[in-house]
Amino acid sequence: EGYEAQTKREHDELVGTAELLRAKGYRMDVLSGGNSYSARCCKYLEGITEVRCGNYIFNDVATLATGFAVEQECALRAVSTVVCKMDDHHAIIDAGSKTLTTDLCGHRPGYGWVVGHPEIRITKLNEEHGFVESDEPLPFEIGDKIAIIPNHACVLPNLVDKIYGIRNGRIERMIPIEARGRYL
């Protein structure tokens, strides 16, 4: 099922359920729904008063792996340093579960997407380190920086005090995360 069909089905189920409840006398001033995919299918939002468009602002490995987004549309990236290279096919980076989270994506193995290198897998995490593998020789050395698209973009901004807006390889602005670690 494509994301447009999924969005329509979810909309129809939500609005249909609300109509059944209203017919029984229940009052609903707010009908809240939506997800990352519905942000591109606004025609299926009629009747919904509050749209929750998921991580559409960032995208992540889930939206990338399902074809909803391409790599260039994934705005959130964690920058990590290669700290150890055991051989041509295995390395350790300084981004672990505290950065990338242990959330898995059912659409592809591993704990993130190395930008520009979809063949590389982050196979294991401890708190401060990630373990990287590739069937091909790894294209980086100790000290190199790599950008990683997280499996689940919602978690990473909650773990940091600020993120940087980068355009054309230059930092354009620093964005403070005022709700960091809070449940509002």
Predicted regions and their residues:
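Conserved hydrophobic positions within beta-strands
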Residues: 82-83
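Generic, ordered loop/turn and secondary-structure boundary motif
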Residues: 57-59, 65, 79, 101, ...
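Short coil-to-beta-strand transition motifs
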Residues: 72-79
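Active-site loop/helix belt of alpha/beta enzymes
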Residues: 1-70
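C-terminal accessory subdomain/extension
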Residues: 86-184
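A residue-level signal for beta-strand positions that form part of recognition/binding surfaces
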Residues: 48-50, 79, 90, 129
